[in-house]
């Protein structure tokens, strides 16, 4: 039986934040969720997330999972205290117990599996991950005696000689839970921190083993924004390298960010300062950017999107968007259409070969095939209480600076006069025009201020 305990009770004072440390995000996913995801790959029987500071907020951040249980640690009196509470609350302390911190987002399932395999192969009481650091400041030092761990001394309890030891404790343990439960209650807070250390169990158990791995950044804990930024960079580099090997070109890739869920086709060019978020899918041969933000959207073949934002929408094939366009949620732009500069589209459908080239707002609308929307066109869709729909048939031409007051339905091949305010439906093949007569007053003299 395999159980996992994730320590996530701390406040994270050095983050200088009102957000619990484990809820800070890297590439759109919290530190805690990343640790949970790695642990789920081990197929454990149960996962215990030990919370404390803002416990409700932490618990609500985790999607429902029958295997995940929450244990509250109050007060937060150290890692050993957290496991003392866990052992008291769980009736059956049996099998293996994997313990790790909730702030090690780069830990991989492969490393955790290697630790479990070592533990099983040597029938150990406790096994833990260690690594050698050139600058071990802040980490507990691990002291070996032959093949076994003799003791662990926390940084603040080390003397000058002990601080010279470069082998550090990564804070990832695998225990024989039954043996651990027999000694865990005896731990005391006799140290400079006045906390109960889980590391004290190592010297109390007979068979303590070390899995030493290379210091490749995987074990980096997050205690401040600098470390958070470094982990973000590591993950982003990994994501972008994967896409580049699959045929994607990045122009100034350091300025771009890509979500892990995003799918990007071959021969796509991602220009500078472009950010792809959520479950976005971009098909082959597109040019995205520069200065573009796309979230949870599908972008078809041979599209060009520059200096624009696209949220929760579908852009089909051979479409140009931008510069400075804003495609808002629930919009669908069909193939060979064009969305030009300073255009906002919201909850609307534009069928094939439609064009909205300049300075327009299209909201809650259905625009027919091969329809041209003139510069400055506004769909007035809100009456102060609710939104209304605008429908325009195919092959229509909406004149510049037209206001379409919804609800309204214009037929096929309808033309509207420039500067019109259209409030009534129009039939197929009609001209709709509504404007006051121009009056010219001769010899007009402007009043001077």
UniProtKB/Swiss-Prot annotation:
InterPro entries, alphabetized: Bifunctional_GlmU, GlmU-like, GlmU_C_LbH, MobA-like_NTP_Trfase, Nucleotide-diphossugar_trans, Trimer_LpxA-like_sf
Cofactor note: Binds 1 Mg(2+) ion per subunit.
One CC-aspect GO term: membrane
GO molecular function: glucosamine-1-phosphate N-acetyltransferase activity; magnesium ion binding; structural constituent of carboxysome shell; UDP-N-acetylglucosamine diphosphorylase activity
Location relative to the cell: Cytoplasm
Residues engaged in binding Mg(2+): 103, 223
Annotated UDP-N-acetyl-alpha-D-glucosamine binding sites: 7-10, 21, 73, 78-79, 140, 154, 169, 223, 328, 346, 361, 372
Single GO biological process annotation from the record: regulation of cell shape
Tagged with keyword Zinc: no
Region spans: N-acetyltransferase: 247-449
NCBIfam families per UniProt: glmU, PRK14360.1
Family: In the N-terminal section; belongs to the N-acetylglucosamine-1-phosphate uridyltransferase family. In the C-terminal section; belongs to the transferase hexapeptide repeat family.
Name the record gives this protein: Bifunctional protein GlmU
């Amino acid at each position: 039986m395999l159980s996992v305990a994730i320590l996530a009770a701390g406040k994270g004072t050095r983050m200088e934040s009102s957000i619990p440390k484990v809820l800070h995000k890297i590439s759109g996913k919290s530190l805690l969720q990343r640790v949970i995801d790695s642990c789920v790959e081990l197929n454990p029987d149960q996962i215990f997330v030990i919370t404390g500071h803002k416990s409700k907020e932490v618990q609500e951040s985790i999607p429902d999972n029958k295997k995940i249980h929450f244990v509250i640690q109050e007060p937060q009196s150290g890692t050993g205290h957290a496991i003392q509470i866990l052992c008291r609350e769980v009736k059956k302390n049996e099998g293996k117990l994997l313990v790790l911190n909730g702030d090690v987002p780069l830990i991989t399932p492969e490393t955790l599996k290697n630790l479990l395999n070592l533990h099983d192969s040597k029938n150990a009481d406790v096994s833990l991950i260690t690594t050698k650091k050139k600058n071990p400041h802040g980490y507990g030092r691990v002291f070996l005696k032959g093949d076994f761990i003799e003791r662990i001394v926390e940084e603040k309890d080390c003397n000058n000689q002990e601080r010279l030891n470069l082998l550090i404790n990564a804070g990832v343990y695998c225990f024989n839970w039954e043996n651990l439960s027999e000694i865990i209650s005896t731990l005391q807070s006799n140290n400079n921190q006045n906390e109960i250390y889980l590391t004290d169990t190592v010297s109390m158990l007979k068979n303590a083993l070390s899995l030493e791995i290379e210091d490749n950044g995987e074990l980096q804990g997050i205690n401040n924004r600098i470390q958070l930024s470094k982990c973000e960079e590591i993950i982003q580099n990994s994501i972008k390298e994967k896409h580049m090997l699959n045929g994607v070109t990045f122009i100034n890739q350091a300025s771009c960010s890509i979500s892990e869920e995003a799918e990007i086709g071959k021969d796509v060019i991602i220009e500078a300062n472009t950010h792809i978020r959520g479950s976005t899918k971009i098909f082959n041969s597109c040019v995205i950017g520069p200065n573009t933000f796309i979230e949870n959207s599908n972008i078809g073949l041979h599209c060009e999107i520059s200096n624009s934002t696209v949220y929760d929408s579908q852009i089909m094939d051979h479409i140009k968007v931008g510069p400075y366009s804003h495609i808002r949620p629930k919009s669908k732009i069909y193939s060979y259409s064009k969305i030009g500069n300073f255009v906002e589209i919201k909850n609307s459908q534009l069928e094939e070969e439609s064009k909205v080239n300049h300075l327009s707002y299209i909201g809650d609308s259905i625009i027919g095939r091969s329809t041209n929307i003139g510069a400055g066109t506004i769909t007035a869709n809100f009456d102060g209480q609710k939104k209304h729909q605008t429908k325009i048939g195919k092959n229509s031409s909406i004149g510049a600076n037209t206001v379409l007051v919804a609800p309204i339905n214009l037929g096929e091949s309808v033309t509207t006069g420039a500067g019109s305010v259209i409030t009534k439906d129009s039939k197929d093949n009609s001209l709709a025009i509504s404007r006051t007569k121009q009056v010219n007053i001769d010899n007009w003299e402007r009043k001077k201020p």
